[in-house]
């Protein structure tokens, strides 16, 4: 079955060459966002597709996943609810066609589903830290509207020497003057900053396994912290299309752990 999945993945890439190219880094679905029929999340060679037959399928090289909902709805869409669950909805019904398992420890909040480098979709949340919210009229967009981005930092990863996350005209930059800055439309238009310019040399920013963001200098002295600590686990920092940087976690569900629905 794994071989057939790889072949299916290659066929999908050939059939949808243009969408895959234009949506190559559409790797995030947030609570309240909508993945419409025949749209997908994608990262490198992996694609998480809300198919026209109402089946949600992850095409990858690591065993894949499917919701097993073929033919159970029409015009199906995928959303992420405020308990960290994916929901498939049919246009002809008010009842969800399929809902992903709920972690017993989850609480209401904002979650994020991320198709990551491991070629699996993992749900993180709830949000435990964020930069200030921007203008509300920029808040939502369907996944098909999101451009190519470099928008995600995972637990244990670091940024330094002007490295950045980016989406649309927003950037979150770990500047070489030791300041972490969120900018819009250019490096001089600062939306938010850590206020740590000049407080260290060769500084770097790291996302820890409790969701803590910390800026340290080259002597490992702490320069700034987000002061939001969750339980031990895997977290993700996402620079969202509305220009807000948000930490979600810990991970509450993944296609990698859902063997019962694997292809």
UniProtKB/Swiss-Prot annotation:
SUPFAM superfamilies: alpha-D-mannose-specific plant lectins (SSF51110). Heterotetramer of 2 domain 1 and 2 domain 2 chains arranged as a dimer of domain 1/domain 2 heterodimers. Gene3D superfamilies: Bulb-type lectin domain (2.90.10.10). It comes from Crocus vernus (Dutch crocus). Residues 1-24 form the signal peptide. GO terms for biological process: response to other organism. Mannose-specific lectin. Has weak agglutinating activity towards trypsin-treated erythrocytes from rabbit but not from human. Residues 26-136, 150-260 form the Bulb-type lectin domain. This is Mannose-specific lectin 2. Keywords: Disulfide bond, Hemagglutinin, Lectin, Mannose-binding, Repeat, Signal. The gene is LECCVA2. SMART domains: B_lectin.
């Amino acid at each position: 079955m794994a071989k057939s999945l790889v072949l299916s993945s290659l066929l999908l890439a050939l059939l949808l060459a243009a969408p895959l190219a234009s949506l190559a880094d559409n790797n995030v679905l947030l609570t309240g966002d909508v993945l419409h029929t025949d749209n997908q999340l994608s990262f490198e060679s992996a694609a998480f597709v809300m198919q026209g037959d109402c089946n949600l399928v992850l095409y990858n090289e690591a065993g894949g996943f499917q919701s097993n909902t073929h033919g159970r709805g029409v015009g199906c869409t995928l959303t992420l609810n405020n308990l960290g669950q994916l929901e498939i909805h049919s246009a002809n019904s008010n009842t969800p066609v399929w809902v992903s398992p709920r972690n017993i420890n989850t609480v209401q909040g904002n979650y994020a589903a991320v198709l990551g480098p491991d070629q699996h979709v993992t749900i993180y949340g709830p949000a435990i830290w964020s930069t200030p919210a921007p203008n509300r009229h920029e808040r939502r967009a369907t996944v098909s509207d999101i451009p190519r981005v470099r928008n995600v930092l995972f637990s244990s990863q670091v940024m330094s020497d002007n490295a950045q996350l980016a989406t649309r005209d927003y950037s979150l930059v770990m500047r070489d003057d030791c300041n972490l800055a969120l900018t819009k439309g250019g490096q001089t238009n600062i939306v938010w900053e850590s206020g740590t310019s000049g407080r260290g040399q060769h500084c770097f920013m790291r996302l820890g396994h409790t969701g803590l963001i910390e800026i340290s200098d080259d002597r490992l002295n702490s320069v700034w912290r987000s002061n939001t600590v969750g339980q031990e686990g895997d977290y993700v920092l996402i620079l969202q299309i509305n220009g807000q940087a948000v930490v979600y976690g810990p991970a509450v569900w993944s296609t990698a752990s859902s063997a019962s629905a694997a292809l």
